[in-house]
Amino acid sequence: MQMQPQYHFHPMNDVLFETQSKIIKDLAAKEDCILVGRCADYNLGEDCLSLFVYAPYEERVKNVMERLGREEKSARSLVKKMDKTRKAYYEFFTDRKWNDLGNYQLCIDTSRFSQNFLLNMLADVYKHM
């Protein structure tokens, strides 16, 4: 498979972002969908409900330890690395601050609610849009 001519002199990260952006926009135009990450809020603008889910650092470390069976030091390292990676990606492609809650219409601290409650709440939000 050969790369499209318009992409020959573009960095691969830019080509990938442009391709993902097109897929996100095409998918959202066809049907309602849930998109996690990939700067979907930026790509879709006001045509979507943008949601930012977060939790305190210690809670995220605890979740990594429980879900992935990691030791505390390893879990802390992974959480920091993921935050750094997400921040760099989002800020590079959007020129926005990654964890600026003002970029989103709905922000939820997941440490304060059960997963079941959050799913029901989001289903209700969707029904009333």
Per-region residue spans from a language model:
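Conserved phosphate-donor/acceptor-positioning beta-strand/loop module used by diverse small-molecule
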Residues: 46-81
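Short, polar loop motifs at secondary-structure junctions
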Residues: 36-41
